């Protein structure tokens, strides 16, 4: 219990195509994922609901493994139609929410759980095709098109140079007061072509956290290396930059999906949240 409330975790998915991103835009009527879910929860529970999310996805970005949490007076869950059961609440919400958002699980979690700060790492997948005709019609909403052919080996070499804890300022849009030091744990390129979907690639990207537009910038940097526009060593050189680099294209939002978020065991939730809230400095970077 937190000041007489209980904490509930949501596991959810959405097609980001028709949303202006995750975050509610103040009092604006812009359609965002947060606004849709908060407004629906508020309607059903008859309490104001504020969501905290693991990853604030941009406009057009999708999620299959997004995580959020909210706190609520347990009395709000005791109506006849819910009876204290989160599964019943999911069913109530499903009847009211649009088809491009789905909550697939709800559960009570400890007060120490924080969807954002307790997360150990976030996993993203980026789908892109270089086929002249673009993506299959059935995958056009979650697959980006790159207009030139690429060398996947060159892209993987560019990705490998970025693994580890670095200052990714060159890959991040500026946000006042935000650190750009991140621990990039996985960045692998895969040729997932099929006869129906030739020239199709996926980038699997994992880090403890990502700054604003970082994943799409990482992908864009590799794509320009893969097409031969930038030379070997391009991405490694960018790690020395101290501000956003204009030489990096930001890959299209439609190809990106947040596919998972990892959390520690319950007894480690508070410690992880405290660690994640600490502002990282260059003193923490490994010696070269």
From Swiss-Prot:
Catalytic residues (UniProt): 58
GO biological process terms on file: tRNA pseudouridine synthesis
Positions with a binding annotation for substrate: 124
Organism whose genome encodes this protein: Corynebacterium diphtheriae (strain ATCC 700971 / NCTC 13129 / Biotype gravis)
Function statement: Formation of pseudouridine at positions 38, 39 and 40 in the anticodon stem and loop of transfer RNAs.
Phylogenetic classification of the source organism: Bacteria, Bacillati, Actinomycetota, Actinomycetes, Mycobacteriales
Highest taxon in the source lineage: Bacteria
Gene Ontology terms, MF aspect: RNA binding; tRNA pseudouridine(38-40) synthase activity
Keyword Methyltransferase attached: no
Cited PANTHER family: PSEUDOURIDYLATE SYNTHASE, TRNA PSEUDOURIDINE SYNTHASE-LIKE 1
Catalytic activity: uridine(38/39/40) in tRNA = pseudouridine(38/39/40) in tRNA
Matching CDD domains: PseudoU_synth_EcTruA
Oligomer and partners: Homodimer.
The family this protein is said to belong to: Belongs to the tRNA pseudouridine synthase TruA family.
Enzyme kind, highest EC tier: isomerase
InterPro entries: PsdUridine_synth_cat_dom_sf (IPR020103), PsdUridine_synth_TruA (IPR001406), PsdUridine_synth_TruA_a/b_dom (IPR020097), PsdUridine_synth_TruA_C (IPR020095), TruA/RsuA/RluB/E/F_N (IPR020094)
Alphabetical keyword list: Isomerase, tRNA processing
Full protein name: tRNA pseudouridine synthase A
EC nos: 5.4.99.12
Record has DNA repair as a keyword: no
